[in-house]
Amino acid sequence: MSGQQRGSVILVPEHLAGALTKLMSDFITGQDVTLSGGNIAVKIRDAINQTPGGGDVAILSSLFALWNALPTSGRQSSRDDLIPAAVQALTTAHNLCLGVIPGETSHKDTPESLLRAIVTGLQKLWVDSCGCPECLQCLKGLKAIKPGLYEIPRIIPHTKQCSPVNLLNMLVHKLVALRGHVQLAYDARVLTPDFHEIPDLDDSDAVFARTLLAALFHLNMFFILKDYITQDSMSLKQALSGHWMSATGNPLPAAPETLRDYLEAFRNSDNHFYLPTTGPLNTFQFPEELLGRVVVIDSSLCAASHVQDVITHGVGAGVPRPRFSALPPAPSREPQQTCSQLTSRGNESSRRNLGQPGGTSPAVPPVCPIVSLTASGAKQNRGGMGSLHLAKPEETSPAVSPVCPIASPAASRSKQHCGVTGSSQAAPSFSSVAPVASLSGDLEEEEEGSRESPSLPSSKKGDEEFEAWLEAQDANLEDVQREFSGLRVIGDEDEDGSEDGEFSDLDLSDSDHEGDEGGGAVGGGRSLHSLYSLSVV
């Protein structure tokens, strides 16, 4: 009987038929994902390597049997189901390019020429919009894009990631490295980059960039699907042609019947078996015919209008960028500052912003009226620091909010900020501020020290008195800063080896301390210990 009636003849001994049949069945059904048209010949050689002589004829007959079974196999049928998706991807990319770069594309363009036009358009856009080294590096990535099962390099500057690129590269990795299967789940939206996946461009350039990138991603999807659909048939034909050349020295014939008759001539009673196949012999033009079904422009499957709607009407750069509603006028507030940040420079800036007293000037930022410890007050309060009071502002005085005078050393160590608040409106009278840290001390000395603190003068006395008051605050601030600039936290070691942090003097040779006679050297570490000693939280 002819091979066309009983199937394809395989010229191997019958005792190897079981292993070889299983191998070929796994390839035809697609159950073994490690098998492909490129490595099946090697797998067959490994299965029949004990066959004496006639190795090329045995492999040739096995490849020819697979070739005839391929068109109707489940392996190829699953790939044929992806042909509409490939056609849609190509048609969408083609129509998108006709819309944004009509001068560089035409209806007769091949997918490869379409890719070159898209790459050229993106390269020009990156150079014209920015041209920085990162953009120039992405130009090399665009130039390296190849049609086929290849990952996309970095092609979009000034972005961390792009979802369509990640999707396509994951798909390539799955097909090439993991040899997985492509599921029939195709949506043009997943290949359209969002506005945050492109550089920050003008609206018109952003629409152009997103459209070109969407066309590029659809075209890459087409190349991936095209290779996935046609790769097995092309690889199998190449292997068949090579073994035919090795066996006969001639190129592959045009008709498969020639190859079938050649193999039937080697058949005898104990060196062959038949692999059942259905239908006629598979022509050697099958890969080209399959490719012709894939490289098609079908307007009925085009999704270009959908992509354009996503770009121009969806949440993206095609519409005005998301803009926040205007914030209400903020009250005159200064950011919270630490006491060490309240220097004379800040007070000078406050004086510069005073303006005219007619009420038309901006709100005056409040000054932190820190109750400073004068040289005499510091000596009197060595026994402890009492409660600190703020002057009660008069009704006509500028609005000054209560400020925590000097935070406790523990709070200062933990970077606690003084609460500085302000308002352009008249502020109510404030009562005295409770002590920040409850420290031992004579109440009479505490009250005397608080009375020594200068209060904010009334605005009725004029700007001159206010200026004088500010200068007094500057001097007081400098005294406080000199007092605190020589502090550090030390620990007295307990019996168990633990330490409780205390403040002591630092012997600094800073210019701020060279002329300070009442600094750390006067009272020594003892006075500072008794004045500021606190356990560290």
Curated annotation (Swiss-Prot):
Any matching Pfam family: DUF832
Subcellular location: Virion tegument
Superkingdom: Viruses
UniProt xrefs under InterPro entries: Herpesvirus_BRRF2-like (IPR008550)
Region (Disordered): 321-366, 378-398, 414-466, 486-537
Low complexity bias: start-end ranges: 423-441
Acidic residues: compositionally biased ranges: 492-517
Keywords: Virion, Virion tegument
Polar residues composition-biased segments: 334-347
Single GO cellular component term: viral tegument
Family: Belongs to the lymphocryptovirus BRRF2 family.
UniProt protein name: Tegument protein BRRF2
Species this protein is from: Epstein-Barr virus (strain B95-8)
